[in-house]
């Protein structure tokens, strides 16, 4: 499941380390991924997952055929990888010769160490907002093996109709998946209310203790939200 789908699923149940203790919850999620038409500007699609931008600033635009209104909207990127190339490689001898010696030297100096780029970002432009996704390459000191990302545009009555991904640098970009996901808000309130129908009553708080009473109609899991801190333990 993607992060938005996981968020949606937690309105139907809870994740347990041990399985088989309770029946599995039936997922009734309202998260959808609307179909989108892709348009490329300054970008070549080499295969199903690989895109080549010969110059800085290439664009990939996704237009949603049937936009989803009144929802929480996220842009999902899975399996991202980036290999830097020099924009000089995409220039012909005629183009280079047409430049002045001064401009040519400046350009060569600008891209002398293009292959050393340790990070790259995706700039997101849409009709409901803008965003940015940072990707650290394996040669970065901040690299942590992360290749999947989600940018959350939040909730809005207005549907996302179009999103443009700006590729800032020349190079090869790989994406296993580029998609818009929308969690509809129609049933969120009712599902949240259902989760809290049987809750802890007469709560008492003490030093290292929390007490209360609860009546359930079936075997259930009691979820208690506590501020995170190291050193916590629970005895029931």
Q: Across the structure, where does each feature detected by a protein language model lie?
A:
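Active-site-proximal, structured, solvent-exposed surfaces of multi-pass membrane proteins
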Residues: 1, 5-236
């Amino acid at each position: 499941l993607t992060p938005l789908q996981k968020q949606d699923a937690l309105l139907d149940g809870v994740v347990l380390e041990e399985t088989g203790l309770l029946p599995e919850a039936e997922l009734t999620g309202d998260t959808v991924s609307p179909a989108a038409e892709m348009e490329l500007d300054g970008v070549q699609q080499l295969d199903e997952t690989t895109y080549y931008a010969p110059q800085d600033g290439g664009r990939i635009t996704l237009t949603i055929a049937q936009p989803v209104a009144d929802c929480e909207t996220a842009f999902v990127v899975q399996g991202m990888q980036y290999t830097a190339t020099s924009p000089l490689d995409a220039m012909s001898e005629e183009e280079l010769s047409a430049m002045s010696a001064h401009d040519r030297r400046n350009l060569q100096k600008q891209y002398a160490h293009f292959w050393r780029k340790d990070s790259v970002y995706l700039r997101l432009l849409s009709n409901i907002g803008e965003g940015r996704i940072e990707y650290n390459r394996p040669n970065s000191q901040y690299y942590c093996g992360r290749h999947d990302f989600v940018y959350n545009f939040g909730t809005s009555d207005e549907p996302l109709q179009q999103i443009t991904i700006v590729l800032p640098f020349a190079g090869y970009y790989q994406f296993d998946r580029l998609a818009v996901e929308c969690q509809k808000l129609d049933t969120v309130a009712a599902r949240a209310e259902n989760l809290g129908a049987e809750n802890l009553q007469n709560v008492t708080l003490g030093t290292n203790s929390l007490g209360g009473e609860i009546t359930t109609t079936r075997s259930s899991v009691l979820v208690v939200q506590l501020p995170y801190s190291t050193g916590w333990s629970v005895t029931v």
